[in-house]
Structures are given as C-alpha cells and as structure tokens.
UniProtKB/Swiss-Prot annotation:
UniProt-listed Gene3D superfamilies: Plant lipid-transfer and hydrophobic proteins
Similarity annotation: Belongs to the gliadin/glutenin family.
Organism name: Triticum aestivum (Wheat)
Additional note from the record: The gamma-gliadins can be divided into 3 homology classes. Sequence divergence between the classes is due to single-base substitutions and to duplications or deletions within or near direct repeats.
Cleavable signal peptide: 1-19
Alphabetized GO MF terms: nutrient reservoir activity
UniProt cross-references to PANTHER family, sorted A to Z: GAMMA-GLIADIN, PROLAMIN PPROL 14P
Chain residue ranges for the region called Disordered: 27-159
Listed name of the protein: Gamma-gliadin
Pro residues: compositionally biased ranges: 103-124
Keywords: Repeat, Seed storage protein, Signal, Storage protein
Protein task: Gliadin is the major seed storage protein in wheat.
Residues spanning the membrane: none
UniProt biased composition (Low complexity): 42-102, 125-159
Length: 302
C-alpha cells in the first residue's frame, strides 16, 4: 500500500511540474516563479499527512490490544497458583512436632539407664583381683623350704663348712692383704701389692660371693669373719687386722669400739663385704647363730 501511494504521489508531482514548465523560443526551459511552489506543497502536506498516520494507527491499535492480553493472563495465573503452592509449607512444621516427641523421649530413658547398669560388672573386676592374693601366698611357701636347707648344714656341717671356706678364701686373702688403696701403711708389712693385683683379688672375692646361693651368703660372710678371727688368735701380736680396719675406714664403715674382740671383727666383716661387693644381706644376718663358733683353729687358719 505504501509503495502504491508513493508512486501515485510521484506521478502527480511530475504531471504538475511538467504543466508548470514554460519553454522559451530559444529552447530553454523556464521554471515557473516561486508562487506556484506553495501549490504543490499543499498536496504533499495534505496527502502524506493523511495517509501516513493511517498505518501508524493500525500498528498502534493492533499490538497494543493484543499484547496486553497475554499480560493479563500471566499475572493472574501464576500469582494465584504460587500462593496456593505455599500451602504445603504448613504440613512441614507438623512433622517437626513429631521428631522432638519421639526420639527425645526414648533416648534419655532407655540408653542412659543401661549404660550405668554395665558399670556394675566392673565390681567383679576387683573381685577377680582377689586371685592375685594366692600369688604372694606361694611366695611365702618358697622361704619355707629354706628351713630344710638350714637343717642341711647341721646334718653335713663339715662338707658345707669346707665348701664355704674354699669359696670365700679369696675374700679372706683380700681383706688381710696390704693394698695401695689403704691410706695408712703398716710398718710391719713390707710387701705392698700393686693396684692391679688388688683389683683382681677384689673381683675374685665378689664373684665367689655372688655364686653362693642367697640363703647361704650370710653364712659365707660369717665363715670369712671366723677365719680371720682364728688367724688372729694364731698370730698374736701381729697386726693382721690393720688392712681390714683401713679398708672399712675407706668404705665409710664405722668401726666397733673394740675391734680386737671377736664380735667387733665379725660385725666389721659383715659390713665390709656386702658394701664392697654390692650384695644384699638381710639385717638379721649379724644376729644369726652360725655353726662356726666351735670350729677348730686349724680349719679356720688354712
């Protein structure tokens, strides 16, 4: 339609222009004066102004009436449906009421009560510790068979005495020898053993004492003391006990008030040997009545 209107307007304009043109006798075309130009301007203004608004009116009326129609449907339909879907949000708080009611009641009531109940079987565990009491009881029985061992030397005293004397002979020789570890050297002893020999004798003494059974170690130390006493009685006037006194003094052992007496020598030996060899001797070892008091001098001196 627009093209037809434009073509008609152009045709009308050309016809009007050709009608107004004047040809001179010289052959030149003379255009009309400026007065006729407003006349063709009237049809240009009148015709397009009337025809051109018509398509604008059609385009404006047609889309404006059709497009608002879907706009009315979309807001009405989803806006009404979405609030309706919000209604199922109400049943969600309902199961929340069931969860706190069911699990909270059984868990505090059932599991808390059985867990303190299995703590009761913990009481038999200290009861099962009671069988640990018979273990120290058989330990008490072990010293009981030591009693026949004490009676064994009474039955075979000569064999036990000779065995202990032979075993403890290195200890007696070490206690009576003059070594260079002594601070005061006796003028009556001319031979002084070197340090290496003294160390060897001390090691032999401690090894022999460690090999003796523990229940006989006290008796073995008593045998050493008795041998020294017997040797002193044979060699009266000779200061054979000076190395023993000096050794005890070097070990920090308090000497008895009367070391020359038998009990003083015995107590000094009982303190010196365990300290030197690091051997445990029971405290009642000094009060035990050993069968060496009646030993002949010949046996103790050899």
């Amino acid at each position: 339609m627009k093209t037809l209107l434009i073509l008609t307007i152009l045709a009308m304009a050309t016809t009007i222009a050709t009608a107004n043109m004047q040809v001179d006798p010289s052959g030149q075309v003379q255009w009309p004066q400026q007065q006729p130009f407003p006349q063709p301007q009237q049809p240009f203004c009148q015709q397009p102004q009337r025809t051109i608004p018509q398509p604008h009116q059609t385009f404006h009326h047609q889309p404006q009436q059709t497009f608002p129609q879907p706009q009315q449907t979309y807001p009405h339909q989803p806006q009404q449906q979405f609030p309706q879907t919000q209604q199922p949000q109400q049943p969600f708080p309902q199961p929340q009421q069931t969860f706190p009611q069911q699990p909270q009641l059984p868990f505090p009531q059932q599991p808390q009560q059985p867990f303190p109940q299995p703590q009761q079987p913990q009481q038999p565990f200290p009861q099962s510790q009671q069988p640990q009491q018979p273990f120290p009881q058989p330990q008490q029985q072990f010293p009981q068979p030591q009693q026949p061992q004490q009676s064994f030397p009474q039955q075979q005293q000569p064999a036990i005495q000779s065995f202990l004397q032979q075993q403890m002979n290195p200890c007696k020789n070490f206690l009576l020898q003059q070594c260079n570890h002594v601070s005061l050297v006796s003028s009556l002893v001319s031979i002084i053993l070197p340090r290496s020999d003294c160390q060897v004798m001390q090691q032999q003494c401690c090894q022999q004492l460690a090999q003796i059974p523990q229940q006989l170690q006290c008796a073995a130390i008593h045998s050493v003391a008795h041998s020294i006493i017997m040797q002193q009685e044979q060699q009266q006037g000779v200061p054979i006990l000076r190395p023993l006194f000096q050794l005890a003094q070097g070990l920090g052992i308090i000497q008895p008030q009367q070391p020359a007496q038998l009990e003083g020598i015995r107590s000094l030996v009982l303190k010196t040997l365990p300290t030197m060899c690091n051997v445990y001797v029971p405290p009642d070892c000094s009060t035990i009545n050993v069968p060496y008091a009646n030993i002949d001098a010949g046996i103790g001196g050899q």
